[in-house]
Every structure is written in C-alpha cells, then in structure tokens.
From Swiss-Prot:
RRM domain residues: 384-462
Keywords: Acetylation, Apoptosis, Coiled coil, Isopeptide bond, Methylation, Nucleus, Phosphoprotein, Repressor, RNA-binding, Transcription, Transcription regulation, Ubl conjugation
Keyword Transferase applies: no
Name of the protein described by the UniProt record: SAFB-like transcription modulator
GO molecular function, one term: RNA binding
Positions carrying Phosphoserine: 93, 97, 139, 144, 289, 421, 549-550, 552, 747, 786, 797, 812, 906, 920, 995, 999, 1011, 1016, 1018
Region (Disordered), start-end ranges: 1-22, 57-245, 269-387, 455-598, 712-739, 778-1031
Subcellular location: Nucleus
Biased composition (Polar residues): 342-351, 872-887, 992-1014
Domain SAP: 22-56
GO biological process terms held by the UniProt record: apoptotic process
Amino acid sequence: MAAAAGAVVASAASGPAEGKKITELRVIDLRSELKRRNLDINGVKTVLVSRLKQAIEEEGGDPDNIELTVSTDTPNKKPTKGKGKKQEADELSGDASVEDDSFVKDCELENQETHDQDGNEELKDLEEFGENEEEIVHSQELLSTEENKTTQEFVEAEAIEDREKEDIESQETEAQEGEDDTFLTAQDGEEEENEKDIAGSGDGTQEVSKPLPSEGSLAEADHTAHEEMEANATGKEAEDDNISVTIQAEDAITLDFDGDDLLETGKNVKITDSEASKPKDVQDAIAQSPEKEAKDYEMNPNHKDGKKEDSVKGEPVEKEARESAKKAESGDKEKDTLKKGPSSTGASGQAKSSSKESKDSKTSSKDDKGSTGSAGGSSGSSTKNIWVSGLSSNTKAADLKNLFGKYGKVLSAKVVTNARSPGAKCYGIVTMSSSTEVSRCVAHLHRTELHGQLISVEKVKGDPSKKEMKKENDEKSSSRSAGDKKNASDRSAKTQASIKKEEKRSSEKSEKKESKDTKKIEKDEKNDDGPSGQTSESLKKSEEKKRISSKSPGHMVILNQTKGDHCRPSRRGRYEKGHGRSKEKERASLDKKRDKDYRRKEILPFEKMKEQRLREHLVRFERLKQAVEFRRRKEIAERERRERERIRIIREREERERLQRERERLEIERQKLERERMERERLERERIRIEQERRREAERIAREREELRRQQQQLRYEQEKRNSLKRPRDVDHRRDDPYWSENKKLSLDTEARFGHGSDYRQQSRFLDFSHRERARFPDTASVQSSFERRERFVGQSEGKKPRPAARREEPSFERYPKNFSDSRRNEPPPPRNELRETDRREVRGERDERRTVILHDRPEVAHPRHPRETVPNPSRPTSWKSEANMSTEKRESRVERPERSGREVSGHTVRGAPPGNRSSASGYGTREGERGVIADRGSGTQHYPEERHVVERHGRDTSGPRKEWHGPPSQGPSYHDTRRMGDGRAGAGMITQHSSTASPVNRIVQMSGNSLPRGSSSGFKPFKSGPPRRF
C-alpha cells in the first residue's frame, strides 16, 4: 500500500497528469473534478462518481477513466486540517510538493468548512498563544523567504514551546484529574458549537466538528488536551494520562459533532507526525502523517542540519501512520458506509479529503514518511493499544474485553461515548499485553460485527497515550474516509452552516493558530527528537503547517480543533526519535521529492486563496443575508396580502349581508305593497260589484216603475177607451130603447154621481128631473113606481151589507164559468141565474107580452154569456101586481145572494161577455141585431184574461171631456150616467138616495154592465145580489 501510494505520489510529482479509474478516485478528487466543472460537490461517493461520469460523457471523454492533473504543489494540506496542528507541521514538511493541485481543490472544498471552525479556534489560540503569533508569522515568512530565518523561528518556537509545555504539564495533571469535567465541558462546548454550526451560513465544509460554538468549554477542553499532549510528550508517565485526556478531548470534539464528528475531529486533530504519537493525533496521523512527513522532508532540505535526522526518524513512523491511515480509511469507509460510522459530516470529510489527497497525490511519499514516523513510533513503542470505533451504544467494556480476550491478554478496556446525544457512536480503547496480540486482534476483528454494528479495529502507535490517540486518529481517518462517503451528503447539511461561520473567524485566526501550533509542534519534536535536525524539521513542519493553515482555513480548522495536538506533535516527535530512525532511508528518498514539491509550492497563492475565501465567505454571507431579508420581506408581503385578502373577504361578506338585508327589506316592502294593491283591487272590485248591484237594482226598480206606469197608463187608456165606446153605444141604445123610463133614469142619476169622479160635477144635472116628463112614456109609468119601491127596499137591505172584497179577488176560473149549465149551483136556493132567466121570463111573460125573448139568437154571440145575461129583458108588466111579484121574487133571490158565488159568476160572466152581449144582458130590449154590431164594433170576440175588456172607441177621443159621452141632457144620457156610476163604486159601492126609484131591470143592467176589473176607476161594477156599497 505504502509503496503503491509512494509510486503514485512520485508519478504525480513527476507528471502533471495521472490516469485513473473514476471508481478509484477519492471523494476529494471527485469533488475537485466536479468543482472544476462547476458542478454540485455534495453527496456520497456514488453520487459524485455518477455525476462526474455524466459530466465526462457530456465532454466527450471516457467516463470510466479520467486523467487527474496532480501538481506537486498540491500537498495534502487538507489532511493537515483533519490531522491537527502538529500533524500540519509534519505535512508542511512532507506535503509541500503535493499541496498545490490537491490543496487548491481541497481548499475550495474546505473554504466552506474551515472558516467558522478556524475562527473560533483562532480566537482561542490567539488568547492562549498571542505572544507566539508574531513569531509564528515571522517563522512562516522566514520559511518562505530564507532558510536561516526558518531556523531562527524554530529557535523561537522552541522557547515558546518550552513555555507552553510547562503550562501544559501543569494543566495536564489537572486535566487528568478532571477528565469528567473536561468531558462534560467538551459536551457543553459541543452543543454550543452545534448551535453555532447550525446558525452558520452552511458553506458545505466538513469541519463542523470544531468545538467553536462553546468557545469557553471547548477552548478549555482543547487547551487541556494540548497541554496534556505536550506533557505526555515530555514524559511517558504523562502519556498515559494524556491518553485519557486526549480521549476526553476527542470526545468533547466528538460531542461537538454529534458522535460522527468525534472520529473526524480526532482525525483532523491528529494528522501531524507528532500527532501520530498522540492519542487524538494518531488517527489523523495515520491518515495524514505521510503528508506531514512529506512536508517535514520538504522542510528538511531547508534545515538539513537536524531535519534529516528527524525525517529519518519520522519516515518509519510516517509509513506506519500512512499504512494505518490507508487501512483505517478503507476500513472506516466501509464501516461508516455500512454503519454510517461516527465520522462527523464536517471534519471527517475534510480529514478524509485531505488524507485522500495526500494518499493519491503524495500518498506514496507521505505514507512512506507517515508510516515510517507513525508506524516506526508504534513499532518502537511496541504498540499495545487498540482503537475500536463504530461500537453500538449498548457496548460495554466487558464486551470488548471478552471479544479481544480471544486473541490475547487484555490489560484494560475502555468505552467512550457521548452522553449528551443519545444514539451517538461509541469508541473503545483496548490495551493488550503485547503488540503481536494487537496485530492479531486487528487482523481478526477489523471490520467485524459486534452487537449488530460493524466495528473498526486499529492500532494505536507510539506511546500508550500516543498509541491510543493514534488509534483514534486512525479510526477518525478511516471514519473520515468512510465519512467522506457519508459526509458527502452530510457536509451539505450539517457542516456547511457551521463552516461558513467558522470560515469567517478562522480565515484570519487560522494563520495565527497554525503558526502557534506549528511552533508547538516544533518544540515537541525538538524535545522528542532531541537532535537539532528533528527540531528543525518540526520547526519547518510547523512553519509550513502555519503557512498551509494560513493558506487553507481548512487546515487551520483542524489545528484549531486539536489544540492538544501541539502536545501530540511533541510526543510524536519523541516517538519518532525512538522509532523513526529505522525509516530514515525512506524519508531521505522522499525528502528529495518533497523538496521539489516544496520548491514548486507557492506560499503566496495560499494567502491569496485565504483572502479569496474570505471574500467568498463575505459574498456568501451577504447573499445569505439578502436571502433572509428577501424571505422576510416576502413573508411580510405574504402576510399583508393575506391580511388584505382577509379584509376583502370580510368586507365582501359584510356587503353581501347588507345587500341580503336590503333585499329582504325590499321584498318585505314589495309584499306589503302587493298586499295593499290586492286590497285596493279587492275594494275596487267590491265597489264595482256594489255599484253594479245598485245599478241593476235601480234598473230593476226603474223597470218595475215603468212597467207599473205603463200598466196604469194602459189601464187608464183601456178604461177611457172602453168608457168612450160604452157611452155612445149606451147613449144610442138609450135613445132608441123604448123600455127606458124616467124611473130608470132617476135611479141612474144617483149612481151617475158616483160612477165617475169626473162626472160628479154633473150630479145636479138630474136633480131637477121632473117626473112629469114621464108622461111621455105612459106604458112605463106604472112600472116605474113599482120599481122604485122595490129598489128602495132592495137598496135598504143590500146597501147596509158591505160587499166583501175577497169575493172580487177570486180567481177568474171560479168567477167565470165555463158553460151555462156548470155555472148553476145546486144549492137549496135556486141559483140567481135560473131565477132571473126562468122567473123573469115567466114574470115578464105575465106582465108584458110585448117583449119576447129571442133565445135562439144567443149562440151567435162570440163570447159565452151567463144564462142570466142571455135572457132578453122580459116585457115589463104594466100591472102593479106583476111588478110586485117580480120584485118580491127578486128580493128573495137577492137575499140569498151572499150564500153563493152567483155574484162572482155573474160578474165573471158579465166581464167575460163581449160588449155586445152586455148590452143585451142589460135589459135594453131586444136589440140583438144591434148587439152584434156593437160587439163587432167594440172589442170584437176578443176577451181579456185580465178580466177586463178594452173597448175601442171608434171616432172618439178618450181624452175628451166626459160630457161628450152623455150627449144631450135627456133620459138617455142620464141613464147612461146612472149605469156607469155603479162601476166607479165597484170596490165600495153606495146606494144613492134614488136607489128606491131604480127598477129591477136597471139593476140588472148595472150588474151586467161591469166589464172592467175590480178596483178600476171606470166601467160597471160586477153584478151582485145586493145594492152597491155605500161610502
């Protein structure tokens, strides 16, 4: 391994380009290639390999093979970071030739990681070693300009280192006594450091493992570790104590890095050659001691006096350290990949990258020197300590004792863990009885499984404390190598933030710290090596480390992390003195190469790189600040927008509610108006209906009134017309009637006054009637007296009896017989009609033979008549006797009249009879020929169902005065008036004072002459068996 690495380094030194398979590249090489192509460098190795292959394919190259340009100036300066300050001193001597290319790449990766860590570490170092700062810087300048100056700086560094050793020795004892306190302090520091790392700008660097956050506690832990290591360097007794102290310091660092960082920080802290002898530095020394040794060899040419010796001594140690580092890296990579080993994302990545670079570019020379130095130390000291990493949290010391007891005698076993963070990785230190057993245990138990976890078993080379520290460093380096795989992704998460912070601080402080650390390392080496050559080498290494650290904040971070590494280099130097001489030859051969590399190296570019890193860090910080401000503004704007949106939504909701309320109000108003409108319409309809009803009622009333008026007018018209027809007819008959006598006229005079109200004015017309005029009618003179007597008697008897009005209102079918035979009633008293028709005939036949009744002419009449009316007026007897007989008979018949409806019958008959018949029935003689004429002239065969006949008056004006009806004041007119008088008294008949003079015939005429309806104002009243009523 070492030879191959040496060959690789040699080829790299000789040729700028080196062909390798991508799969064989270290993570740091992969990242450097990716960064050179401006690609993402975060992720595990597999991701980086695939990314790089893709980039190469895009470029048109071979994705499987790649040519790496390895400049001799790219020393494993990153490994110095992971290794620690003392180891950096070694690397400065050994890595000078190889630093340029790989270091540039490493620096770029470390820029993000180291600034923050270096800042805190530098602050501590400045406080602790402020007085050495100027000397260290001066020594760096001397190294870069003149070798003499370098020697002077070395002397100064020795003086400073002596003083520091004294301080460390005093503190070492306290640290041993207060291991627990230191451990707790480291834990506290770790928590604070984690917080700071989290708060950091996250550059992606891997040196988060520095105990920067807790500057106080971590500084104390680091100081204690450094002092312990330096004390251990002065004496082996202190070495044992320093082992525990170193473990504690490592644990503190590890605590800072959540367990995974323990390994990385330890590795980073223990990378220097002198650190290889120290417990913490052992791991880093194993991984990076070749670089430091190579740097030492490069320094040796400058200080050939004692540097060669130191390099000779350091070579075997460095070889062993290199081999162990390779083993640890390979084993830890596997272990960490499987386990996610304890290597911290930050420091492990840096240590790993630095160790890988040192291995790849100058691993051959560095590993040779590192193996000669560290391995030489381990062989010289016959390493009996074993460093076990990757233990599960439930592993106990007894478990380790049992496990390692299978391969030899176990003197002691110790388990270290981080109590602050649950689930953190545990580490073990096992002390075997002999180095052969150690080798056996490493051979059999490395990369085996214990309690379900893959453990890594490494030797601790050098003094017991140095061996343990070396084991830790180896394990850390291995964990770094394995952690590089893991931390490729972890770096982007944890270490980036912390490293950004640290970069700021460490950029300036790293130079001072590294210078101090290098001085300490040089002192330790001088003390350990004794020969001035070794001290000069350590001085050169320390100075070179200072330069490297100043150039690369990553290295500074490593030195800062392991302040106790200053002691470790001294121990390592002592260890190299004892065991490094065996490898002086190898170192001598490598010195030349390193000298070339160192010559090629340029120190100024590191300064520039440091400034560039600082600027980049500032830019990143500014960018981060801008991003935070932008995010804050964005959040504020978002909040304002949400608030505006909320207000808008609230307003919209309120507006909707207001509109809804308004709509509801309008709806209610509309409904109200609708109800009012409907009510108005209903009232209007009601009003219209009432008006229509009223109008209809008014029309109905108007129609009824009109009808009534029309009926009355018609009635009046009919009556007047009938009267107008009757008067001329009656007048004419009277004039020609031989049977009319004064008696009849007298009797009619009394009735004429009451027949028509309009004729009452003519009452006096008949009062002056002289009975002497009767002489003109000698035939009727005797009859007149008898008639008067009978009429007088009858008028008294009938006039007293009021005629009931009900009889007149009987229906027409009762008062108007259908035939003559039916109208006769078979009551005990013979009907009046029969009496009148038979008796009258007999009487008349007896009294007057002159009058013959012609019965055969009756059928010619159009209207049926009552049998009484059909009988012609019998010849009036001239004798009193006959007259008396007839009057007696009539009186008898009239007395019986109320008992039957003869009155109504006769009335009906009279009414139903046509006017022609009426005239004949009146007893005006045998004027049947004229009767027909009158009937024809009158209403002509027309009957009136209303029980009245409208008599048309030909050539007569109804409106004319009534006196026109009466004609001249003679018997005719007087008789006519008397005859009509009874009709005017139909409703309330009266017997006039002349009723006694009325003859039976005249009475009959009066009865039968009433053709007008009852209650009428004109016409004859119906025949009744009694005289007309008296008013």
